Design a protein with these regions (language model features):
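Non-heme Fe(II) oxygenase catalytic core, chiefly the N-lobe of the double-stranded beta-helix
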Residues: 1-157, 163-168
Length: 168
């Protein structure tokens, strides 16, 4: 199952960008949708924007693996466990380093949905409240007014800024 996401949020320093190339087009489907994370943030109710301005969540690749997101050979999984920290915190409202714009930064596959905390005080949000807020935020990128569709042709290359968009 696919979902709106930005790549490698489980890394301490997530990737700047991603690049994909179409070497063979399927007979139908296969489009990639992009959603503007800044517009998604701006579209939130003021109360939620204020609430998430100091909230961070723990992103962990193990959450994705435990949900059956991808099958990884045991040797690679062991190597990842040895090299990659057990969860990293990222703010839900993340400031783009070049534009200065705030963007909604959330990945439902890697985020521990019960892990939200105030990064100014260290105070954890309650488990149920955290899960409810995450569920609400995950809906935001699904709104068509923030999206564009890229229809692939053989040989096309797409390059995107993971700090500014999500893709599906």
């Amino acid at each position: 199952e696919n979902s709106w996401h930005t790549d490698v949020t489980w890394m301490e320093s997530p990737s700047l960008c991603s690049i994909a190339q179409c070497t063979e087009c399927p007979p139908f489907g296969g489009d990639t949708l992009f959603s503007d994370s800044h517009a998604a943030f701006l579209g939130l109710p003021e109360k939620i924007k204020s609430q998430i301005s100091t909230l961070s969540g723990i992103n962990d690749y193990r959450v994705f693996l435990n949900r059956g997101g991808v099958q990884v050979p045991e040797s690679l999984a062991n190597e990842m466990k040895a090299q990659i920290p057990f969860g990293v915190a990222h703010p839900l409202a993340r400031q783009h380093p070049e534009t200065g714009k705030l963007a909604l930064y959330i990945h439902g596959g890697f985020l521990r949905h019960d892990s939200l905390f105030d990064h100014t005080t260290g105070e954890a949000m309650g488990c149920e409240a955290s899960k409810a807020l995450v569920a609400e935020l995950l809906k935001q990128h699904s709104r068509p007014e923030y999206q564009c569709r890229f229809q692939w042709s053989e040989g096309d290359i797409a390059f995107w800024d993971n700090r500014a968009v999500q893709h599906y």
